[in-house]
């Protein structure tokens, strides 16, 4: 796993957890939870690719791993739209920078998960 990706996830999660967005704090907590879940999923796929023979193990653990993969891509698309919406509505520069970095990270992670999944197929 790329150490820059790890630190990017940690940095963005830390900064998002410090934000106070008024009535939408529940939505933000949901985004943070999904970011954390996405990071764990990306890490597990990356580890499976590193072991290359782990495809059968992955399939045995989760017989519907392709369906789960599709769900993760849906989550990524939802997060991208949510982050874009936040970017358009916030005027706070700290929040804008955080959401811009989160958006870039989501695009990078989406590409990494696509790469990992093609290697596993």
Swiss-Prot record:
Name listed for the protein in its UniProt record: Nuclear export protein
Functional summary from the UniProt entry: Mediates the nuclear export of encapsidated genomic RNAs (ribonucleoproteins, RNPs). Acts as an adapter between viral RNPs complexes and the nuclear export machinery of the cell. Possesses no intrinsic RNA-binding activity, but includes a C-terminal M1-binding domain. This domain is believed to allow recognition of RNPs bound to the protein M1.
Positions of short motif Nuclear export signal: 12-21, 85-94
Subcellular location: Virion; Host nucleus
GO cellular component: host cell nucleus; virion component
Originating species: Influenza A virus (strain A/Hong Kong/1/1968 H3N2)
Subunit-structure text: Interacts with protein M1. May interact with host nucleoporin RAB/HRB and exportin XPO1/CRM1.
GO terms, biological process: exit of virus from host cell nucleus through nuclear pore
Family recorded in the similarity comment: Belongs to the influenza viruses NEP family.
Gene this chain is encoded by: NS
Impact upon substituting residue 88 to R: In strain: Isolate MA20b
Keywords from the UniProt entry: Host nucleus, Host-virus interaction, Transport, Virion
């Amino acid at each position: 796993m790329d150490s820059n990706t790890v630190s990017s996830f940690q940095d963005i999660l830390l900064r998002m957890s410090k934000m106070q967005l008024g009535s939408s704090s529940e939505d933000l907590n949901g985004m943070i939870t999904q970011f954390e879940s996405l990071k764990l999923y990306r890490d597990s796929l990356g580890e499976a690719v590193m072991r290359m023979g782990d495809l059968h193990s992955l399939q045995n653990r989760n017989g519907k791993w392709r369906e789960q993969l599709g769900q993760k891509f849906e989550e990524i698309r939802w997060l991208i739209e949510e982050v874009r919406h936040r970017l358009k509505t916030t005027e706070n520069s700290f929040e804008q920078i955080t959401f811009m970095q989160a958006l870039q990270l989501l695009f990078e992670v989406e590409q990494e998960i696509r790469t990992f999944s093609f290697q596993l197929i």
